[in-house]
Amino acid sequence: MKRTIYLYLILLFNFFNLTAQQQKSIDHTLQLLNNNSVPYISVQELNEELLKGEVLIFDTRKKEEYQVSRIKNAKFIGEQLNTDSLSLDVLDKDQPIVVYCSIGVRSEDLGEVLLKKGFTNVKNLYGGIFLWKNKGFEVFDQLDRPTENIHAYNRFWGRLLKSGNKIY
């Protein structure tokens, strides 16, 4: 009987622990994993910049994530600064650039690389494409059509995506 109660308490503890883990926000995750080496831009600010048409936006996720959906006009640059389809040498070093990934962790790494290469106006999208979609902004598929599909990276990170269809 004591063993059954003990097992029940362990299961109950694990359930509440898992629930608490799932409730951790993007804010908390970024505080834990980022070092703020690249200035942030909010999803609202990025939307305004995109309407003006004066910003380059780089998707720093894996190719399969980019193929599911992306922010309008985002260029694929990948996690390892894939410049096959983009030459950084021809870009103005003062050109406004925004990097993003799922929530803003991988994009901070690529933002640091761009800053080290001499780019002076690089920002990291706070909350990445997940917060972008959670706030109701559109994402687009490979054919530049609006889509509800978002590559959620994996089930652990996908818990931070509250809007759209999660694709794994």
Segments from the language model and where they lie:
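Active-site-adjacent beta-strand anchor residues
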Residues: 59-60, 100, 125
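Rhodanese-like catalytic fold shared by cysteine-dependent sulfurtransferases
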Residues: 2, 18-40, 67-95, 108-168
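Gly/Ser/Thr-rich loops at beta-strand to alpha-helix junctions
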Residues: 102-106
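Short hydrophobic beta-strand that contains or immediately precedes a catalytic carboxylate
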Residues: 46, 54-61, 74
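Bacterial N-terminal signal peptides
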Residues: 6-17
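Structural motif
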Residues: 56, 96-98
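Residue-level preference for short coil/turn positions at secondary-structure junctions
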Residues: 51-53, 93-94
